[in-house]
């Protein structure tokens, strides 16, 4: 499995900035990728005043009613002969996590991928119009630099093609895509789901080739669901819910540009995932790592099985964080208790904020 991660951490951080960074990530956990998410959801269609673009046939926009704008957006198109209901589950799911979602029908049920690509671009135009339509509940609430596309089967091939046609698209989610002889020269972060037992778009003839056809300079991920069929990614519940968790993390990371989701992917969801028969990955994201100025205090041992001791001459406040930015403990180091105890935590990397600096601590067995 290819893993290409860029690690960075805040040289010359102020305490305020450090607290801000960790505070933003504190609520980003596997549990936070729930179905549904934290926000209530409402829907709009043409009867509510949204446009019906010339390159698609009918749409529903799902949006959060109590989220925090501005929102990212994603357009989704179904597959060959299929209607919007085939991918409908994605709308409320994304919207409940703060991502406005437009799901469209096609002018013809037998439209090929290129037509579906233009349908997706037209759907994004409808999203843009909602940001300025005076009667829209989304007036002024959309971040038009955070746009993504998705599609099932031929719609998945169309989503990749849409990214070629419009380089401003930030992300692609291809659901068991179908498109022979792919040409995907684009820079949009591409997540490709496939089903191991898909007989309509066999991965070896489609998804695998799509991954290879996506440039090496583009962030990309291929997740093949074990025993999955052609519709295994039509819902966020696919692959024992791993499909939804990975898709949401991908959009949060690359479309919303929220680096808190990097370790959810790199340290958990993509580490020997039980739902996957194959994972290929070549993407860069920012992890919390240790490039701070070297701590003036001596500390040992590191790695450790339990305690890390510090040679201190005055009382110092500390905060210990997980790789996900969750604060695990806080307290004070002193001459009577000059150590951090990791014995109750799982094996792995932890980050200690002490004396306005960050120390990476490693627990081993």
Task: Label every PLM stretch briefly.
Residues 3, 347-365:
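C-terminal tail/sorting-segment detector
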Residues 70-79:
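Short beta-strand element of the alpha/beta-hydrolase
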Residues 85-105:
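Short amphipathic alpha-helix adjacent to the substrate-entry channel of hydrolases
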Residues 185-249, 253, 257-258:
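Active-site-adjacent alpha-helix of alpha/beta-hydrolase-fold enzymes
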Residues 277-300, 365:
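Residue-level detector of functionally pivotal "anchor" positions at catalytic/ligand-binding pockets or at interdomain
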């Amino acid at each position: 499995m290819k893993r290409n991660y860029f690690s960075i951490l805040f040289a010359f951080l102020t305490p305020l900035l450090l607290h801000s960074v960790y505070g933003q990530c504190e609520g980003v956990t596997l549990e936070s990728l729930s179905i549904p998410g934290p926000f209530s959801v409402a829907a709009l269609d043409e009867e509510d005043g949204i446009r019906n673009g010339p390159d698609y046939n009918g749409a529903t926009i799902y949006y959060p009613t109590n989220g925090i704008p501005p929102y990212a957006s994603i357009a989704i198109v179904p597959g060959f002969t299929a209607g919007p209901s085939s991918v409908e589950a994605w709308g409320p799911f994304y919207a409940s996590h703060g991502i406005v979602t437009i799901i469209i029908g096609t002018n013809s049920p037998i439209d090929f991928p290129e037509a579906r690509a233009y349908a997706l671009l037209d759907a994004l135009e409808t999203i843009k119009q909602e940001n300025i339509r005076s009667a829209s509940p989304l007036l002024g609430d959309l971040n038009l630099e955070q746009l993504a596309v998705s599609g099932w089967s031929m719609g998945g091939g169309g989503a990749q093609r849409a990214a070629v046609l419009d380089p401003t698209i930030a992300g692609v989610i291809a659901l068991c895509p179908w498109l022979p002889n792919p040409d995907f020269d684009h820079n949009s972060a591409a997540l490709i789901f496939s089903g191991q037992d898909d007989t309509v778009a066999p991965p070896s003839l489609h998804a695998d080739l799509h991954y290879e056809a996506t440039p090496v300079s583009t962030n990309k991920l291929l997740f093949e669901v074990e025993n999955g069929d052609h519709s295994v990614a039509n819902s966020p519940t696919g692959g024992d819910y791993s499909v939804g968790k990975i898709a949401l993390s991908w959009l949060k990371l690359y479309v919303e540009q929220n680096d808190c989701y990097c370790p959810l992917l790199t340290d958990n969801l993509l580490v020997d995932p039980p739902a996957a028969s194959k994972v290929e990955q070549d993407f860069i994201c920012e992890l919390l790592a240790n490039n701070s100025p070297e701590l003036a205090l001596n500390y040992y041992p590191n790695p450790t099985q339990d305690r890390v001791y510090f040679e201190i001459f005055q009382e110092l406040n500390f905060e210990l964080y997980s790789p996900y930015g969750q604060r695990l403990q806080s307290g004070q180091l002193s001459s009577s208790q000059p150590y951090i105890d990791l014995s109750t935590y799982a094996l792995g990397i932890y980050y200690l904020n002490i004396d306005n600096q960050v120390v990476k601590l490693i627990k081993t067995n």
